Amino acid sequence: MILHRGARPLEHFDPDLVDLPVKRTREVGIRVEVDTEVRGIEALGAELLVHAAQRGQDRRFEADAAVHSAGRVPEIDDLDLEAAGVERETRGVIVNEFLQSVSNPNVYAGGDAAASGPPLTPKGDHDVAVLVTNLLEGNHRTPNYDGIASAVFSVPPLASAGLTETAARAAGLRFHTNWRDTSAWFNTRRVGETTSGFKVLIDEQTDRIIGAHLLGPHADEMINVFAVAIRLGIPARDLKETLFAYPTHGSDIRFML
């Protein structure tokens, strides 16, 4: 059983692709309860009773074990930032484009400790290089998260790079979307998987890929190809003409463009 606080799981990923594994999860007998906020867990002998609120109603769920997977918060509460005049939000220190505190110019923050940018592990490595450069040489370098890839290591994996359709529309971009359920494709069936799909967003004016969203075997590796294409501005037509080793899952990329 999965108890999820939001209206749908994995809110930051493409909803059409998220719907596929959620549907499959329910088909194999796993309950997915959304809009459900856990209020407490009570031990009843060898079992657990989970108390929750769902759409204004009190709910109780019996379980043998409970796993907390709500993510992480920055470990900065003990730094006494207020004493140093460092403004912060729930997500972390409020910084400018140079990762410098907006309220104390002697303080820099990056990775999980900064309130801006994607909450992903590679961001930390990237931010360190940026803020150290600015500390030593003066503010002139800014972080660039274009095309940064993220993945959910589920079975099968779900991965994303670039913009979602919602973000692309909000940015006023003109683009077309290639979207398909590929559960019947050879590379999905040959490894015994039942669920896969993709959605790729391509700018109508430049032919550049602005977003890629993958679900299926090795999606967590394939997304890195799209991350490179997005960051370097490789046209979709050029990537489509690239011949990948067959029958790797990467050989399906040209059919997504």
Show the residue positions of the predicted features.
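Short, acidic, Ser/Thr-enriched surface-loop or helix-capping motifs
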Residues: 55, 96-97, 203-204
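Glycine/Thr-rich phosphate-binding loops of Rossmann-like dinucleotide-binding domains
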Residues: 10, 75-78, 90, 117, ...
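A short alpha-helix-loop-beta-strand transition element characteristic
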Residues: 87-89, 138-147, 173-178
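Rossmann-like dinucleotide-binding cores of NAD(P)H-dependent redox enzymes
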Residues: 1-45, 51-57, 117-125, 132-133, ...
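General small-molecule cofactor/ligand-binding pocket signal
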Residues: 31-33, 61, 108, 176-178
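Flexible, glycine-rich terminal cap/loop adjacent to redox cofactors
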Residues: 136, 153-257
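Short acidic-glycine loop/turn motifs at beta-strand connectors
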Residues: 45, 89, 204-206
